[in-house]
Amino acid sequence: MVTMRDLLECGVHFGHQTRRWNPKMKKFIFGERKGIYIIDLQKTIRYFRYTYNIVRDAAAEGKSVLFVGTKKQAIDAIKEYAEKCGMPYVNHRWLGGMMTNFGTIRQSIRKLEVIETMEEDGSINLLTKKEALMLRRKKEKLIATLGGIRNMKSLPDMIFVVDTVKEKIAVQEANRLKIPVVAPIDTNCDPDVVDYPIPGNDDAIRSVQLFCQEMAEAINEGKSLLEQDGGEQAAGEEVSQDEKDAVVAEAMSEEDFGEDEE
């Protein structure tokens, strides 16, 4: 479990400039130095350990935790530690409705499965070169946006978010669906939208890595208490020819499909 030394070495105590703050964070601020707010690490470690236990206990009950973080400093850590604890993640772009319109998201994941099946059974080679190219482009885009949640068959029981300001849509969806939110909260954040806040720096790479690492450790500790591996997955649904045809037609209709989105 995290120590005070860990927090100091990773710069968890450094907040934002004093002109960029949320007054609701006042109770978590120790002071100010050179125009930067300093977060009270005594409170951080208390909230950190409490939240660690909450996440561990959730995992021990077989609950799922969705990792969310799409900014540059979080992309790698979110993927790395979500995979280390076998949890779903979003680290590319949060699609509006990813949770509130989950049925549609599952349909898109199904399209990814159809394309991969076509590659495996060779049926993609029966298409024209252009059709095959468009399908592969569609596959790459689906993997980028949905690859981390492709095995998430239902809504998560909890979400862990890095930067609740940037990921406000994800947080809003979780709040609407009564899905508990776990998150580090920097001095510019609103703690009221987070069920299990941990006051701390959500910008520095080492700080972000520490938060992700601790959440993964809590989950793995909880999973070990389940006394079951949980790694067995149900067999995928068989892909029909109609599904293949529909995905090809959709890919061919997306003329601007290869363009990057910001």
From Swiss-Prot:
Gene Ontology cellular component annotations, sorted alphabetically: cytosolic small ribosomal subunit
Cell inner membrane in keyword set: no
Low complexity composition-biased segments: 227-238
Composition bias, Acidic residues: 252-262
InterPro entries: Ribosomal_uS2, Ribosomal_uS2_bac/mit/plastid, Ribosomal_uS2_CS, Ribosomal_uS2_flav_dom_sf
Keyword set includes Hydrolase: no
Gene3D superfamilies: Glucose-6-phosphate isomerase like protein, domain 1, Helix hairpin bin
Any GO BP: translation
Keyword tags: Ribonucleoprotein, Ribosomal protein
Region (Disordered) residue spans: 223-262
Family: Belongs to the universal ribosomal protein uS2 family.
The protein, known as: Small ribosomal subunit protein uS2
Native source species: Campylobacter concisus (strain 13826)
Classification of source organism: Bacteria, Pseudomonadati, Campylobacterota, Epsilonproteobacteria, Campylobacterales
